[in-house]
C-alpha cells in the first residue's frame, strides 16, 4: 500500500491559520536557578510579533517578535546580547531589538547581510509601508527561501550547502525517516518538544496533524522563519541545549530531535534534563544521528553506536537503520519492533535512528493512508 499524495515543499500554514498560542512564559523554568519564569512586563505588539520581558529570581529574559530568548546573560561580546535586548525592549526600541537578535544568530555577520536586513526592517517600519501592508504580512509574503539566502549569504560552498539543507529539507531521507518514527506520536502526547528545530520543518508536520509542539533552537533567525512562515501554529523558544532545557518538570508528552544531538557536547546533561521535562511513559526519538565512524564534514561530537546505547540506557533504546525506516515509510507504515538492529550492526551507517521511552513502553509505528510529509499546504 502506498499513500496517494505527493510531497509538498514547506508544510506551512499562513498567518491567518494561526491558532491560539500559549503565553510566552507558560511552562518556562530558568536553566540557571531552576525558578519559574514569569512575565515582568506587559506584552507589546511590535514588528513581527510581541515584545516583553520575562524574569525569574536570578535573571531577565527578552521576548523578541514573539520568541522568548532563554539564554544566560553574558558580557558585551556574547553572541546574543540578552541584557542589551532587554534594555532596547524597555526603551520601546523594538525594531532595533529585532535586528540585533537576528544579526546575533550569525557567527560572523557580513556587511551585506547587515545592510540588507537593516534596510528591510526600516522599510517594514516606515509609515507608508504600514499603511499599505502590516509588517508581519510583508515578511510572510517573502518566501522562506529568500530569508534563508539572507541567513546564509554569499556564493561560498559552505553557505550554499547549509542553505540548501534547509530549503530542500522535506525531501531528505533523514527527514522522511524522522516522520516515520514520529508516526507513533499521538495527539494525547502533546505538547511535543522539538529539539534543535531549526526553521521548524518537523514542527510544521505536528501542526498539520493538529498536535501542539514547542520548537527550540539557539538560532533566532531560523526560529523566526519557522514562526512566520514554516510553522506559525507552533511555539518557538530560543535557548541553548548545552545549558539544559528551560521548562517545568513533566511538561512534555513526547520529544523528537533530528540531526542535532551529535552537535551537543554535554549529551548526558541534556538527556538528564530531558528526563525531567518529559512525563512518565513519554516516547522519544533521536533521528539522523551521526556516529563517530562516519562523522560527516561538519565538526561534531558523534559517538559510536555502542556509546549511544550506553548513554540512552535508561530510555531502553531501540536502534534502526535509516534505510529500513524510509522503506517502511514509503510503504505507508511506521517502524516495527522487529526492524530494530543491534547497535554494532550500524557501524557503517551514515545515520542512526533511536527510539526510546521515559518509563513506558515501545510503540509500533502506525500505518497511514496519507504520507505525513504531504499534510498541510504550500507556504
Where are these regions (language model features)?
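Conserved alpha-helix/loop element of class I SAM-dependent methyltransferases that forms part
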Residues: 167-188
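Conserved class I S-adenosyl-L-methionine
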Residues: 189-198, 285-307
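Class I SAM-dependent methyltransferase SAM/SAH-binding core
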Residues: 199-243
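A short acidic, Gly/Pro-enriched loop at the edge of an enzyme's catalytic core
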Residues: 242-255
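A short SAM/SAH-binding and catalytic strip from SAM-dependent methyltransferases
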Residues: 254-265
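A short glycine-rich, Lys/Arg-flanked "PGG" loop and its adjoining helix->strand segment in the class I
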Residues: 268-280
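C-terminal lobe and adjacent flexible extensions of AdoMet/dcAdoMet transferase-like proteins
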Residues: 349-379
Amino acid at each position: 500500500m502506498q499513500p496517494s499524495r505527493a510531497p509538498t515543499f514547506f508544510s506551512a500554514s499562513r498567518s491567518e491559520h494561526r491558532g491560539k498560542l500559549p503565553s510566552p512564559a507558560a511552562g518556562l523554568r530558568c536553566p540557571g536557578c531552576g525558578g519559574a519564569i514569569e512575565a515582568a512586563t506587559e506584552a507589546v505588539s511590535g514588528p513581527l510579533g510581541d515584545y516583553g520581558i520575562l524574569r525569574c529570581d536570578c535573571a531577565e529574559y527578552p521576548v523578541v517578535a514573539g520568541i522568548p530568548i532563554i539564554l544566560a546573560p553574558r558580557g558585551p561580546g556574547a553572541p546574543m546580547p540578552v541584557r542589551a535586548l532587554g534594555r532596547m525592549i524597555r526603551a520601546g526600541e523594538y525594531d532595533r531589538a529585532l535586528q540585533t537578535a537576528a544579526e546575533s544568530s550569525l557567527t560572523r555577520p557580513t556587511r551585506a547581510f547587515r545592510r540588507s536586513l537593516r534596510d528591510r526592517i526600516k522599510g517594514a517600519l516606515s509609515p507608508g509601508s504600514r499603511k499599505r501592508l502590516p509588517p508581519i504580512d510583508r515578511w510572510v509574503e517573502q518566501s522562506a527561501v529568500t530569508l534563508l539566502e539572507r541567513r546564509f549569504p554569499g556564493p561560498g560552498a559552505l553557505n550554499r550547502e547549509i542553505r540548501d539543507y534547509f530549503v530542500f529539507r522535506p525531501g531528505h531521507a533523514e527527514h522522511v525517516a524522522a516522520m516515520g518514527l514520529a508516526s507513533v506520536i499521538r495527539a494525547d502526547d502533546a505538547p511535543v518538544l522539538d529539539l534543535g528545530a531549526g526553521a521548524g520543518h518537523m514542527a510544521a508536520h505536528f501542526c498539520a496533524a493538529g498536535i501542539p509542539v514547542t520548537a527550540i533552537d539557539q538560532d533566532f533567525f531560523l526560529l523566526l522563519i519557522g514562526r512566520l512562515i514554516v510553522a506559525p501554529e507552533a511555539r518557538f523558544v530560543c535557548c541553548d541545549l548545552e545549558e539544559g532545557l528551560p521548562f517545568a518538570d513533566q511538561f512534555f508528552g513526547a520529544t523528537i530531535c533530528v540531526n542535532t544531538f551529535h552537535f551537543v557536547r554535554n549529551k548526558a546533561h541534556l538527556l538528564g534534563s530531558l528526563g525531567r521535562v518529559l512525563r512518565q511513559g513519554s516516547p522519544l526519538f533521536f533521528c539522523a544521528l551521526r556516529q563517530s565512524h562516519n562523522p560527516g564534514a561538519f565538526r561534531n561530537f558523534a559517538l559510536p553506536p555502542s556509546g549511544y546505547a550506553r548513554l540512552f540506557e535508561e530510555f531502553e533504546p531501540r536502534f534502526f537503520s535509516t534505510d529500513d525506516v524510509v522503506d517502511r515509510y514509503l510503504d505507508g507504515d511506521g517502524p516495527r519492533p522487529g526492524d530494530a538492529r543491534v547497535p554494532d550492526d550500524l557501524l557503517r551507517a551514515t545515520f542512526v535512528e533511536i527510539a526510546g521511552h521515559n518509563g513506558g513502553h515501545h510503540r509500533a509505528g502506525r500505518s497511514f493512508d496519507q504520507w505525513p510529509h504531504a499534510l498541510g499546504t504550500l507556504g
